[in-house]
Amino acid sequence: MGETSKLVTLYSDAYGKLKVVAKGARRPKSKYGAALEVMTEGHAVCYLRDDRDLHTLAECDVVRGFSVLLRDYKRMSFGSAACELVDRMTIEHESNPRLYKCLAGVLVGFEEVDDEQIESLFWYFQLRIAD
């Protein structure tokens, strides 16, 4: 892996958790732009190989950037915690479309709910994914 490459963990509804190398992602004018930022929903094209745990990211485009989350410390903290929880409770290459939808939904929720409801939403998310 070169010094302009970036190791990224993606979570997809079809493939589950994937570790990929984004070649050239650390360059100032990277083709990936904000698509590899934390808490960004995107459309990714990867070269998957059955004999490897580390795959190659060919392209990635932003579908939804959660800019409200990134500007608000409390919302960002809970969004990061939700992503971390999914990362820790999943293994690579295990598809779980329901979990993907729950994660995407809670990130949208963190952007839309009132400040007083953020913690309750996080607890609800934990209960939903534990089911």
Annotate each PLM feature.
Residues 1-7, 11-131:
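Non-catalytic alpha-helical scaffolds and adjoining flexible linkers that form interface surfaces
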